[in-house]
Amino acid sequence: MLLPNILLTGTPGVGKTTLGKELASKSGLKYINVGDLAREEQLYDGYDEEYDCPILDEDRVVDELDNQMREGGVIVDYHGCDFFPERWFHIVFVLRTDTNVLYERLETRGYNEKKLTDNIQCEIFQVLYEEATASYKEEIVHQLPSNKPEELENNVDQILKWIEQWIKDHNS
């Protein structure tokens, strides 16, 4: 049976992981958090002193994921998307969060001032939405609000309906 691949992207702290795990448990699709995968497999290419974090080796990430993506049925969660092959995804969801809500979430994570400011600006200027629309066909890129628990439930329901319809359309 053919299954769709879904990308969840957006600024850190918008709720990609929460949504991805919830979707995976309700849909049976496989959830992959690229940050966790990179940590587990050491898919790094140096260290960024300014942001105090490792630099992702994007080519190695693509190599690591390619077979699973070809098989289908994968939900990928990452705060960037311009290095993933366009053919991988059937739909892309960019999660958006109000900056005051986002600030609190990132502060709780212990982000330093520079990381906080840059991520808030990233959200204000819709950087990841623009990256998504530049990387994928516009008709497969959708924005979802991600501020409150009710919005999470609504997003899960909407995406589950989309998955169900996609499976019907591609397996008959």
UniProtKB/Swiss-Prot annotation:
Keywords carried by this UniProt record: ATP-binding, Cytoplasm, Kinase, Nucleotide-binding, Nucleus, Ribosome biogenesis, rRNA processing, Transferase
Distribution of this protein across tissues and organs: Expressed in heart, brain, placenta, lung, liver, skeletal muscle, kidney, pancreas, chorionic villi and the central nervous system.
Any matching Pfam family: AAA_18
Catalytic activity, EC: 2.7.4.3
The keyword ATP-binding appears for this protein: yes
Region NMP, annotated ranges: 33-56
Keyword rRNA processing: yes
Subcellular location field: Cytoplasm; Nucleus, Nucleoplasm; Nucleus, Cajal body
Catalytic activity: AMP + ATP = 2 ADP; ATP + H2O = ADP + phosphate + H(+)
Region LID, annotated ranges: 108-118
One annotated GO molecular function: nucleoside monophosphate kinase activity
Residues bound to ATP: 13, 15-18, 109, 148
Region (NMPbind): 33-56
One CC-aspect GO term: nucleoplasm
GO biological process, one term: nucleobase-containing small molecule interconversion
Subunit composition and interactions: Monomer and homodimer. Interacts with small ribosomal subunit protein uS11. Not a structural component of 43S pre-ribosomes, but transiently interacts with them by binding to uS11. Interacts with COIL (via C-terminus).
Family indicated by similarity: Belongs to the adenylate kinase family. AK6 subfamily.
Annotated function: Broad-specificity nucleoside monophosphate (NMP) kinase that catalyzes the reversible transfer of the terminal phosphate group between nucleoside triphosphates and monophosphates. Also has ATPase activity. Involved in the late cytoplasmic maturation steps of the 40S ribosomal particles, specifically 18S rRNA maturation. While NMP activity is not required for ribosome maturation, ATPase activity is. Associates transiently with small ribosomal subunit protein uS11. ATP hydrolysis breaks the interaction with uS11.
HAMAP family: Adenylate_kinase_AK6
Protein name: Adenylate kinase isoenzyme 6
Protein species of origin: Homo sapiens (Human)
Gene assigned in the entry: AK6
